[in-house]
């Protein structure tokens, strides 16, 4: 499938635990292009006292990677985003533009600790939504409080949260229980986005083609296109609805 949008990738070099060099970023982009990806959301971590690269450095690396992407192949592009580690101050940080939203839109890629309580997740989702943000729960299959409790995922979705899972999890790279959980999310129409969560060319390599093939086989082409292309395309289309400035992304 061509035209895939990778909504979760640590492709900016030297700003977190993802790509470490510009050459590695280039190789990641080349691989993504070969696997049908045409847009990548660069999502460097932001976590207090752990991942706090300056926005100046992030912007510089983003511009370099975006320029490389343009030379990879027709239609290849990169948009700036961030993977926020959720804490009590996330709304304040977003309002203060400490880090960008996803492609300058109102969507926010939100990561929780694996052992976060469900009540904490629900409260933070409510805080974000009531302040005009649209939280995307990053790699939702990892959170212990959700486990195979699909009704909790449904409750978060009813609040207005969106769910992202990793491509590798869908095809069983994290075990059969996680694979089954992801499959049920698809069957219950609770999955909204898929990302590679790519971190480099040796660790968490940004593969997605096999996932796309699996999804087509199990759920059909129309569903796969909706999750991998159409849903993330809506983020780009609505970026001018974002809160404040567009944080370095392109606008029409």
PLM regions with names:
Residues 1-75:
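An N-terminally biased module of ancient metal coordination in phosphate/nucleic-acid-related enzymes
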Residues 33, 129, 186-187:
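Non-catalytic positions within long, well-ordered alpha-helices that form the structural scaffold/packing
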Residues 208, 212-252:
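Mid-to-C-terminal alpha-helical segments outside catalytic/metal-binding sites
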Residues 11-22, 108-116, 170:
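Active-site mouth loops of central-metabolism enzymes
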Residues 52-164, 242-243, 248-251:
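Extended substrate/RNA-proximal surfaces in nucleic-acid metabolism proteins
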Residues 190-206:
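Short acidic/histidine-rich active-site segments
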Residues 5-7, 41-43, 79-82, 136-138, ...:
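Active-site neighborhood of phospho(di)ester-bond hydrolases with catalytic His/Asp-centered motifs
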Residues 46-50, 85-87, 142-146, 170-173, ...:
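Active-site environment of divalent metal-dependent phosphoester hydrolases
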């Amino acid at each position: 499938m061509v035209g895939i949008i990778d909504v979760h990738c640590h492709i900016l070099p030297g700003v977190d635990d993802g790509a470490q060099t510009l050459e590695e970023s280039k190789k990641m982009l080349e691989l993504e292009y070969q696997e049908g990806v045409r847009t990548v959301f660069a999502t460097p971590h932001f976590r207090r006292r752990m991942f706090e690269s300056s926005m100046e450095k992030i912007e510089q690396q983003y511009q370099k990677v975006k320029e490389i992407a343009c030379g990879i192949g027709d239609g290849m592009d990169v948009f700036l985003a961030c993977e926020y580690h959720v804490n009590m101050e996330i709304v304040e940080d977003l309002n203060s533009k400490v880090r960008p939203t996803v492609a300058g839109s109102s969507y926010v890629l939100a990561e929780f600790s694996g052992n976060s309580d469900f009540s904490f997740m629900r409260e933070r989702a409510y805080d974000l939504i009531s302040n005009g943000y649209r939280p995307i729960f990053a790699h939702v299959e990892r959170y212990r409080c959700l486990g195979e409790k699909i009704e909790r995922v449904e409750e978060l979705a009813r609040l207005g949260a969106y769910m992202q899972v990793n491509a590798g999890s869908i095809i069983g790279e994290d075990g059969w229980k996680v694979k089954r959980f992801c499959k049920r999310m698809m069957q219950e129409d609770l999955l909204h986005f898929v990302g590679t969560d790519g971190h480099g060319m040796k660790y968490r390599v940004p593969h997605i083609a096999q996932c796309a093939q699996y999804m087509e086989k199990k759920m059909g082409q129309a569903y796969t296109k909706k999750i991998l292309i159409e849903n993330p395309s809506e983020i780009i289309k609505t970026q001018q609805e974002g809160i404040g400035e567009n944080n370095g992304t392109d606008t029409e």
